[in-house]
């Protein structure tokens, strides 16, 4: 089929759409990892920067003790850091991902360093330090085995692509392999650090306002941020709330930092001349705080007395004790209070002045928010939106693993400390601790986190998930997933985090979120062109060197004029103020265009708040836009002739494309289409307004009137890029009802197709469609997602008709059985069985692969062992049926006597009603030297009644009837549909996109071309109609059809044409279940639950019971709930109604309650009822049973 597309152009479409798609081709097609680049870059930074920062950035103290006049400290230093390629245990042969999967081992590499142990002896009196090396530096000391991300910079597939073996060349990577399983670390939302945000909390009948900042140095990759909170209480007093102090007035703390007088404090907080309302409120707050005007020394004394700490100051001398407390206070104020605020001078006192100004800045935000909420003053700011993407950061793989590495590295140092203390006898000859470093501490911690998904805190659970290989799109979508962490059930009930927020435009797909209560809106998927930044600490010196001399530092700024300047922030650190902000902003932006600064640096100039923020931190959502200058698009189609890649385009035309993060996005004027810019220019070129009469004709109440002129700054490359990976493949999604797009997102992940090209070398649990086809009608984005290589569906001839009115009611389908016999929608299911030889630690005996011998093996199952070979497994192409043993394993009995059977059976049994065949057997040996047998069994899945299908418009249905082709509808040309769907599915669901797909697909099939169904591109239906008429078809795709059962012509024309349908994994063969007899539970004696355990079918206590009673089938009800369930025969005392017990060695029963032996009745009850009476008795509730003999006798 030709690869040219049908060009349906709108007469209003005056811009070159093809040039914009050619630009998108540059972005996606040259780099197969572009969709997982954020994970790859983050992991590379974890290896190259985060681990060295942890190992070399701390003190690495393993032991410290104080004597009378000196402090003796032992520490480690790490140099020559490096990581080796992943290898097998022999450290000679390279390990590749496919080998790790086969051998059930982790794909990891050894991280090594040159380690030196030091002894520091500090003289307390003279403060001099004497340092010496203990032993000698040891090279290539293993620190840990680090899991390696597949296709990252340190993966063997990247290091040695020439011998990559049979790995799929289309695989994008971005996942880990832990114990043979593929694991993906999901991206996690978190609140923005180093930015004060104002929120409210409910306190009885009032709202309390507070401003909070999560403070962590920008250069620090991992670590827990220090929370700094300023609260306004109900009495309008403003207090400081941090873990180190008791409740204390914020103004006392400001004085302790160095701003002493009330006048200086007020000037630092607000502009006295312009903000009268704020000044009145501030005076009320200062009076309510009951803080007298004290000096800095007095304020420090107050703060020292307010320290809330477990640290004890045991010195008996009050002066020494006070000095110790002051030193500890100084340490808190220097290291733990707003650690991200620094002057850059290295002077702690100047740093404190900066912190005082920053706190005043926080108070200013708090007061403005309070005035907006309490008095509804419009010019003041409202509270911050905690759901806005502006106030969020995304934690990627590198940062998450870095946090775990730091946690387990500290544990490793603690283990070294314990060993050192036990071995250190004399400080003159201390032991060398380097040989006792345990790399397993970090290795096991990282492996366990990736295996379980638990990354430490309560809100960091489920971050690592098994990579689902259902189809290619499903696997790839894991890499684009972002989750909102929820701590407990109370946060799960909140609705606001689930809503689609306007700041998610362009960054999160509006359609891709799971259905159902638990995860709807909390699990999101990134849009196609969205990226996430990583930390760029190398950019900080460049920015700081440029700003030297261009801003006024805070210590030299005039406090009374402080608010007349624009504040300049770098990663949340207030560097200073300036009047010349336009030049600074333009210069930095020009440096960003020229490449002197990274394109990912954020430059946010907020005119309303007079603040200029520069960001180099990681976790910011960012995407490229076309730039617009003077309402003219800078991008020209001829530029594409000079470049071959995206990076080359950025280098050759640096000012055409700009990367914009979410906060900077708030200050741009974005044109969704280039036509918007042309319309604005058209309005601008109109004759200006010269009279009041012309002014009155303008609708001034409508800001979006056609006469309003807009000056744009940026333009979308194409608006279809706001959709996600899966929804980009929906044809014409802008013509469908919105929920249908969400449904299709969930259906597409369940569709059968071809999930990876090397599936023959793997043993995944998945499905393979025999004849997957590229859709006739698809969006341009489909080639960026790989669906043209790994399709998941077939082009089907679909008729919309009720036909007989019986076979396809509701969402059921009539399907052409003859097409199925020819291979239509046939698939194979792949099932995996695996057994590993295990060692019994108690007896040191190992299990054995063999065909169990009934004379030697005990506990043989009720299964067929005849399919096994002598090696212990069924050979390739052996037909397997339900109950056949596929892998034979026996465990030796450690305590068996010579006359007993020596082995116990532990074989794997095939359980499925659908027969299969052994497709592949893989025999390997794991790292421990034990054999592994992996078996892949395939079973053919022919479409059957009840199997589920879905179109790409979310029109899902199940097969209701399989009709022979002779009974199907047919047209005069002999066209017979593959599927007939009910017309009632269209009016309510309004999936017009599917109708357009069918109409355009008909034209494409006739002309032998592919159709363009890209969203947000105009479709000229009249042009399609004309083309169909020219080809000899009815203009709207309707055809005269004949009844296949009687040959009569149908009185109405039928809409028929090609529509792409997906076969989903929900099939009757996997769900059909019935049971006559089988195993029961030990406690309740009822059938277990579930098809896999041969369980029973539950008759509910309400619905089914009431329905059976209403039908009058009481005997049937009794039979199913008692006779065929947990029937139990017992004896009951007629006198007291309690259970009677049989007298030992006698033939009669007695009641232990009333000693009755004559009036005993035998009854039949459900065993569950007997359990209920016993459980009630355990809480002192005695249940009594009245039998037929005593039912008429009233009880006292």
Curated annotation (Swiss-Prot):
Might you give the EC number(s) for this enzyme? 2.7.7.6
UniProt key word Nucleotidyltransferase: yes
- SUPFAM superfamilies named among the record's database cross-references: beta and beta-prime subunits of DNA dependent RNA-polymerase
What biological process terms from GO does the record include?
DNA-templated transcription
Write out the ranges of the annotated region (Disordered).
1074-1095
Q: Which Gene3D superfamilies does this entry report, sorted A to Z? A: 2.40.50.150, 3.90.1100.10, DNA-directed RNA polymerase, subunit 2, domain 6 (2.40.270.10), RNA polymerase alpha subunit dimerisation domain (3.90.1800.10), RNA polymerase Rpb2, domain 2 (3.90.1110.10)
User: What's its top-level EC category?
Assistant: transferase
Similarity section: Belongs to the RNA polymerase beta chain family.
Q: What is this protein called?
A: DNA-directed RNA polymerase subunit 2
Q: Where in the cell is it found?
A: Virion
Q: Which domain of life is it from?
A: Viruses
**GO terms of molecular function:** DNA binding; DNA-directed RNA polymerase activity; ribonucleoside binding; zinc ion binding
Q: Could you tell me which species this protein originates from? A: Acanthamoeba polyphaga mimivirus (APMV)
Quick check: keyword Disulfide bond in the entry?
A: no
Q: Which PANTHER family match?
A: DNA-DIRECTED RNA POLYMERASE I SUBUNIT 2
